Amino acid sequence: MKKNIVNKFIGIGLVLPSIFIIIVVITIPIIQSVLLSFQSKDGKYSLENYVHLFSDRSSVNNIIYTLNIVIITVIFTIIFAYLMAMYLRFCKSWFSNAIGKLYLIPKFIPGIVAVYAMMGVINDAGAINRLLLIFGIHFKPSLMYTPQGIILMNLWFNIPFATIIISAALSSIPNSIIESARDVGASKVEIFRRIILPLTAKSALVAITFVFMSNVGSFTTPFLMGSNSPIMLGVSLYQEFGAFYNLQKAAAISVFMFIICSIVGAFYIYSIMKEDKWNIQE
């Protein structure tokens, strides 16, 4: 009995430092940001910052601009991740083996280095333009300071991560299931729709959740490659905090981004719990 009590206190003691760090580094700043977001510059509590966030034309455009870029990024990331994962899973060749070893490289390149490298490639006077000029072709990508450029850079960062997640799910599907479907005449589209997609849906949902949440508050790419107006919420928060020193509005933006990510995270948790409930009932 005493040994169980001692083990319990040892377990609590081992967990307490982590809980303390979470409270100090995450919980307290969140509470402070929420309280600050409801304050005006004179210290009075009001909804002024949120009214401005959802009524000011520039702020609304920033929200729409951010959500558009993030949603498009998520869609294309999942599409390319599925294509890459299925290619690596079902195509066995020296080229697929090489791709399987190289596609993770973007994860090991610092973000700001990758952004500047991409800027040097897609700039109107960048590597693509100079290469084509050798053949007498004058081509300007026109991707700098556009949503398309930001999305392209986001894909560079996110496709490897999503591919890892979906590849892990694909590797758990037995070859016998795929071969049985082929034997009964199922097409590639039917195999994907009826077998692969249902069996990898949970992993795809994980990838969607993390890609969405990581891009809502992204800063480096939209700051260096984005336009002056509209801007993504991460850049808007930086401007309010660093340039204008409007801490209250910056806090309101951060709370809004936190709420968006919380909604997506809650949807993911609900979907997983719902699926587990179905499995228990079965």
Regions found by a protein language model. Name each.
Residues 2-9, 147-149, 173-206:
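Amphipathic cytosolic juxtamembrane alpha-helices at the membrane-cytosol interface
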Residues 4, 13-14, 36, 88, ...:
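C-terminal transmembrane helix and the adjacent membrane-cytosol boundary/short C-terminal tail
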Residues 4-7, 50-58, 216, 222-274:
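Interhelical loop and adjacent transmembrane-helix boundary motif
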Residues 17-26, 105, 163-166, 174, ...:
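Transmembrane alpha-helices
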